[in-house]
Amino acid sequence: MAFDNFEILYKETRLNLEPASPSSVVQLRVAPTNAYGRSSLSSSSSSRPASATADDEKGYRTKNLATASSIYYRKHHSSPRGFLWRVLDNNTVLSIRVADVCRQEKVADAPLILNLRFASPLRPACVGFADHEDHDALFVYAIDQSNQLWSIILRPDHFRKRSATEGGLGDASRVYSPPGFGFKHPHRLAVVSPDQLIVTMHDGGILKFDRNKNHESHGSPWRESIYNVAGWGQSLRGLVPFQRNPTVRYEKINMELTAAASTAVTTMGHAETAFLFTICLDHRMRVWDVRTGQILYTGDILNNTKRDPQEVGKWTVDPSQNNLIRILDNGRGQCLVVTYSPVGAGEFKFWKVKANDQGSIHVTDCFPDARLMSPNPTSLDVWTLADFAIAQQPDGPELWALWKNNTSYRVNRLQIIPRNATAPFADGWKAVCVESPGPTPRASGSWNPTDSTEKWLDLIFSPGRFSKSTLETALAMYEKGLGTYKETVSRSGKGIAESICSVIGSTTTLDRSSQGGADYDQFRNTSETQWMRFWRLLLELDKQRGEALSLVFDQYDGMVWVTCADLLAAVRQCSDLERLYHNLQSPEKKNEDVAALISAGLTFVETFSDSMHQLCKAALRAELYENSALSDRERMQLFLDRAGFWVTDEDWAQVLDIVGQNYQMVTSRLYEDLFDLITATSEANSQELREPFTIFGKKVVVRAVQETVELHWQILFSQLILLVNMVDSESEEARPLHTRFDVGSVYRRLIDALRRLEHLRWMTKTELSVSPSKSRSGSSSPTLSKRGQDESYTRTALEELAGHLFGLPESNNMPLLSSITDLVLDLCAPTSTTVLNTWLIQCWLLKEGRPDLALELMPFAEQDPFSTYVQGRVFLALRDYDTAAQHFRKAAIGLSIPLKHVDRHSAGLLDDTEWNLLNSGLPNYYAHIVNLYDKQKAYSYVMEFSRLALQFAQTSNQDSASIKTEMLSRLFTASTATSHFEEAHSALLAMDDEALQKSYLRKLLERMCESGQSSELISLPFSGLQNKVDEILAEKCRATRDVLNGVPYHQILYAWRISHNDYRGAAAILLDRLEKLRRSGEGDKLGAEDGENGAGNDALDTQVTRQYLIVINALSCVAPQEAYILEDVPPPVPGKGTNDEEYSQTGSKRKLGKLNATSGEEDLDSRIEELARLLDSESAGDKKARPSSSSEEDQQLLERMQKFSTAVRQEQGQQTPRRLLRLEDLRKQYQQELDRIVAIQNNQFALTADGEDEDEDMMDIA
C-alpha cells in the first residue's frame, strides 16, 4: 500500500526553533582540558552568536542546520522534564533547551537556550543524557573526535537564569581522556545511568565506564572495563594483518561485522544490573549483561535461522543505521523489543524478552507467523526508515515509524493487536498529514487592495514561516545572482524586510509605455517576477530545514515529535473536520454527504480567477466588518452584487454533479452536521487549569491555531460562496432552498464563524515586541538577568494576550496530542468557551503604546458601552479627537448608569480613580473624559465635555459641587489656553470659591494682556469683579519696571478705567507711568534724537511730554472741583532728593519747620515719612551749610515719632503716603518740563536747584 492511500488521522505542526529574543540564548565556550581533568567552561559576554550570516547554501547548512537532534525526557524529575538537544556548526556546538509543553502551576518557566561550544567537533552518535534519582540535574555526556569524554551537569536554574551561567559552570564540567580509546575507535555511546556509561567500539567490543566516586582530585574519575564478542584472543588476532574478519569501511575506519550499529539499554526493573541490546553489522542482535560483560543472547533480528553463511554482504547492516531497535518495558523482568531490518524491503520484528535476577535471559519471537513489511513508497523514489518508536496503549503496542526521502519525510502509525497472533497488524497503517511547503502566491493586479510588495512581505514574514537566518542567506544568494553582493556591505540600521525590499526594488524600473505614459502593468509584472524568484529561493533553503533526524514518543504525555535539521514537528490528532478534509476522497459512511458538500464548495471556488478571489474577499470584508440593518435576503443579494460573480455553465455543472439537480442533497441537517464539525465537543477549556502551558507549549498551540484557522476559513469561505450562488441560481419552478430551511440563518452562522476566524487570524499573524517586565504571561520569563531585561522579545498577539488561558484542565486524562487539538478547536469554534474580549486586548495594546494595532481590532469590537468607550480611547491615542468624541458621547448613557457588579478589567489602562468615575452618573463620566482630553492637551474638547459635565451636575450634593468646581476649573483653563476668553469669563463668574476665582481672574487677565486682547478684556463685564480687576491690573502696573517694553499694563488699566468713567484713576495710573519714564531717563531723550532718522521731529515731543498731555486731558474730562489726583509718594533716592526736586538743601529748614507746625489731624505716618525724606535730603548736602544743633533736634524728633507710631501700625496696616496733585499742578509741571527741554536745547544749565517756592501750594495728605 502506498503512503497516499493511508487514512490520515494525525497532523503535524511545525515549530520554528528561532528564539523569541536574542537574550534567551546563552553561549558557553567549553575550553580544552587542564591538568586536573576539569574543563574551563565560561559564559560568553554576548548573548548573540558571533558567526556572521552565511552567503551560500553550504555555509547555511553548516551554521544553522543540525546534524543530530532528539528529545531526552527525564524519569525522576519533571521540572523541567524534556530537553531538546541539537548538534550544530560542524558538530562543534551542542544546543540544549527545555521542550516541556506543560509545567507545574507554581514552577517558573525555563526559556533559556544553552549553546555549549566545544573546541573539537563532537561525534553526533556519541551524545547521551542521564537523570539522577537524588539530584535534580541533567547529566550530559559527549565524546569528541579527539576521543575525549565530556561530562557536564546542568541544573534547572541554568535554563531559567542567565546569572546561573555568568560565572561558568566550574566543577560541573569535566573532561576525561580514556586510555581505552588509544587503540580502539568509539562508535556509539549508551548511557546506563549517571554513574555508568557504555561505548561500543569499532571491533565489536564495548568499553564500560563506571564512575570512580572515591577518586581524589588528581585521580581518574572513571573506571574502565573492556569486553569483547570473542574474548581477548580473537580481539588481538584481529589486529594482525592478513588475518582479519570481513569488515565494512565507515568514516575511514574498518568496522568489524560484530560492531554495534544501534544500541538500547534497559534494566527491566532490576536494580543490580542492566542489559545492553545491540544490533550489529552482521544483522544479529546481541544482548549484553552490563554487570559481567557477558553476551546472553545472539540471534538474527528477523529470526532467520536459514541464512547462508556465505552471503555475508547480503545481510550486512550499514554502520550509519543507529535507529534499529526500541525497547518497551512491561514490568519487572520483562520487556518488548522491536527491531527493524533494513535489508531488502525492510521488516519489523517484535520480541518478548524475560530476565531473572541471576542474569539469564529468554528471547522469543512474539509473532513468528506474521511479517510486518515496510509500506510501499509513493513514487519511484526510495524511502528509508529514519527512526521509529514504540508505545504502550490499552489495546496493545503502538508503532510509530518515520520514513525519509532526502529532505521529505512521512510519519505512520500502526496499532498492534497482540491477541490476534495470526494477524497482529490487521488494523493497517495510519498516516500523519505532513505540512505543505506553503501557500501558492496569487498573482497581483489592479484588483489587489494592497500593494504587491505588501502582499509578499505578509507572506514571507508570516510568524513562524521562515527563520531570520534563512531570509538573510536567501537575500545574500539572490544578490550574488544579481552581481550586487558585497561581503563588506553592512546592513546595520536596516531591518531584514527593508533590505529585501531595497534589493528587489532595485531590479525594477518604471518605464514609459508606447502611449507615453507610465507603464504600471510592466512595472508590476517585472516586480512580481523578481519576488517570485526570491520566493522560490526561500522555499529551497527552507526545505533543507525540514530534513528529519529523529522520532520521539513521550510516554508520559502521549506526544509524538519529529526533530528536523532546523524545525521541530509536533504530531497531534486531527479534528473531525481535519480528518474529513484530508480523507475527502474516502470519507466515513456517516460523513459522505458532508464530504460531498465540502468538496462541492472547494471545487467551485478553485475555478475562480485571482481577480475573482479578490473581489469575493473584498465583499466578505464588507460583510464581516459592517453592521447592516438589511434582511438576510438583502444581505446575500448585496454580497452577490459586490462580488460580481462570473460563473460559467461548466463550472456550475461540476457543482450539480456533486450536490444533485436542484441541490436535492442540501438540507438544514447537512449544514448542522457541517457546523458540528467546527464546534468543540469538550468543555475542558472552561475548567481550571491543572498544568499551564510553557512558552514552548504556547508556540505549539499558536502554530496549530494558524493551521486550523486557514483550513476552517478555506472551507467556510467556499461554503458561503456556494450558498449565495445556489440561492441566486435556484429556479422557482422547482422547490427553492429558502422553502426547505432557513437560508438566512445558515448565512448568518457562516458570517459569524468567519468573523471569529478573522479575529484569530489577526492575533496569530500580528507580532508584538514586548519587554519581559511588561509580560502578561506571569512566569513566562521572570528570571532573565538585568542584562536581558532591557531586550524585548517577539511573540504573536494570541500567545501574549491569551497564552495564560492555555493549559491542561483538571479533569483531563487524554494524551497531549488529543488535548492540543481540543484546545485549538475550541479556540476556533464560533461558540468557543474561550472568549476573546476585543476591548480587553485593545486596552492592553493601548497600555503598551500600540494604538495602531488596537485600531486594526476595531472591526471585531462589540457594541456595548464599554467597548464603544475603548474605541474612543483608541482614537484618542491616535489623536483623532473628533472621532474619539463621537464614541465617548455614544457610550455616555451606558457608562453613567450605576451597576451592582462592574467587571473592572482593563489590563491596567484604567486605575481605581478612573473606574470610580464610571457608572456613577453623567457628570462623573464627562469629568473622566475631560481628564483624558486634558492629558492630550486637546483643550477644545476639554471645553466641550466640561460644559456637558456642568450641564448635568446638580449642586444639591457635595459630590456634584466638587465636580462643578473641577469642571469650571478645567473649562476656564481650556478656554484660556485656546483664547476663548468669553467662555473663560463665564466660567470665572460661575465659580463659588472666592480664592480660586481670584487666582483664575489673575490668570485670565495675564493671558489676555499677554496675547494682546486688551480690547476684549475691556468689553467683558466682570460682574462683581470689577474692583478686583482694577486691583490686579494696578498691581501689575506697580510691578512693571520697564514701561516701554513688555505688556503695556499702564495703557490697559488706563483704557479699563476710561471705559468705566474713572478719569481720575486713569490719569493717576498714567502719572505712575510718567514717573517711571522720568526715572528711566526718557525725559532726556529729545524728539530729534528719539525719531527714527533723528530729524524732522519736534524736540519738545518726548515720551514724558506726551504722557503729561494724556494725563492733563484725562483730568480735563471731570469737573474742576474734582480735577485732582492722589499720588503715591515714592521713596526718595539717596543723594538725589525727591521726585520733583522740591526739597533743596537751602529750603530744608523751612520745610522742616512747616512740618513741625502741621496740624495733629494729619496722618502720623505721613509726617514721619516726610521727616525722613527731609533728613535724607539734608544728609546728602553740604554738612557745613547747616547747624549741627538743628540736625540733632530733627533726628530726635524723628525717633520719638517713630516710637509713637509703632503701636498704631500694629493695629492698622501701614499705608503708602500720598499727596494731592491738582490739574493746575500738572499743567505747571508740564510747562516746567517744556522749559527744561528748551533750556537744554539752548545749552542753559542751572548751577543750583533752588526753586523752593515753586511748590508752596502743594499739600501733603494721607
From Swiss-Prot:
It is a peripheral membrane protein. GO terms for biological process: mRNA transport; protein transport. SUPFAM superfamilies: WD40 repeat-like. One of its GO terms (molecular function) is structural constituent of nuclear pore. It is found in: Nucleus, Nuclear pore complex; Nucleus membrane. Residues 36-58, 770-791, 1128-1196 are annotated as: Disordered. Keywords: Membrane, mRNA transport, Nuclear pore complex, Nucleus, Protein transport, Translocation, Transport. Residues 1165-1185 have a biased composition (Basic and acidic residues). Residues 770-786 have a biased composition (Low complexity). Pfam families: Beta-prop_Nup120_160, HEAT_Nup120, NUP120_helical. GO terms for cellular component: nuclear membrane; nuclear pore. It comes from the Eukaryota. Functions as a component of the nuclear pore complex (NPC). NPC components, collectively referred to as nucleoporins (NUPs), can play the role of both NPC structural components and of docking or interaction partners for transiently associated nuclear transport factors. NUP120 is involved in nuclear poly(A)+ RNA and pre-ribosome export, in GSP1 nuclear import, in NPC assembly and distribution, as well as in nuclear envelope organization. Component of the nuclear pore complex (NPC). The nuclear pore complex (NPC) constitutes the exclusive means of nucleocytoplasmic transport. NPCs allow the passive diffusion of ions and small molecules and the active, nuclear transport receptor-mediated bidirectional transport of macromolecules such as proteins, RNAs, ribonucleoparticles (RNPs), and ribosomal subunits across the nuclear envelope. Due to its 8-fold rotational symmetry, all subunits are present with 8 copies or multiples thereof. This is Nucleoporin NUP120. It comes from Chaetomium thermophilum (strain DSM 1495 / CBS 144.50 / IMI 039719).
